Structures are given as structure tokens and as C-alpha cells.
Design a protein with these regions (language model features):
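N-terminal, polar/charged subdomain of small-to-medium soluble alpha/beta proteins
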Residues: 1-104
Length: 104
């Protein structure tokens, strides 16, 4: 599973943050590891320099073997909260997707 993390100019994308988010994704999505080929994480601050509530965005794009990509997004007051909420959404979608595949 390849992980790529992207940030806009308003969200800190230092090496420590990238390593942290990569490790969290590997831990949270470990049971799907054999089905996921790539994960792209996009962080952004939709208000830029201005202050706003829930203006930090985390978009997760997951590429599965022989399937269409799955995309989930969340907004929160910090990139960390948006990330964790997006990961929870993603786990629900992946569970649902693989349950449907098992039924066929």
C-alpha cells in the first residue's frame, strides 16, 4: 500500500506530520492492506489565512485493486480532526464495499 500525502501552502506538511499520518493510515487500514494499492491524502485550508470554523479539509482517495477509487472528505477545525473523521468515514465505506463483494 503506497501512501502519498499532499498539503496546500496553509497546512504544515513537514516530514514529522507526513510520517505520523502515514503510520496512522497503516494502523487504521491494516485489515484492508491486501486490497488497497494506493492512498492519497489531501489537506487544505479552505479559508487560507483567514480564520474560520471547520475550514480545514482532509480528502482521502483510496485506490483498490480492480475497482474504482473511493473518495471521502471531512471538514473540521484542525487538520488532525478532519483526518480522523475522514478515516472513520473511509473505514465504513470500505467495510460496506467489501461486504457487498462477499455477497456476490
Amino acid at each position: 500500500m503506497q501512501i502519498q500525502i499532499n498539503t496546500d501552502k496553509n497546512v504544515d506538511g513537514n516530514e514529522r506530520a507526513i510520517n505520523f499520518y502515514s503510520a496512522e493510515l497503516k494502523k487504521e487500514l491494516d485489515r484492508f492492506d491486501d486490497k488497497i494499492t494506493r492512498i492519497e491524502v489531501h489537506f487544505g485550508d479552505e479559508n487560507g489565512e483567514k480564520f474560520g470554523k471547520n475550514d480545514k479539509r482532509c480528502l482521502l482517495e483510496v485506490r483498490l485493486q480492480k475497482k474504482q477509487p473511493i473518495v471521502v472528505t471531512d471538514h473540521a477545525e484542525s487538520p488532525e480532526k478532519a483526518f480522523y473523521h475522514a478515516v472513520e468515514k473511509l473505514k465504513k465505506v470500505l467495510n460496506s464495499t467489501f461486504e457487498k463483494m462477499r455477497e456476490y
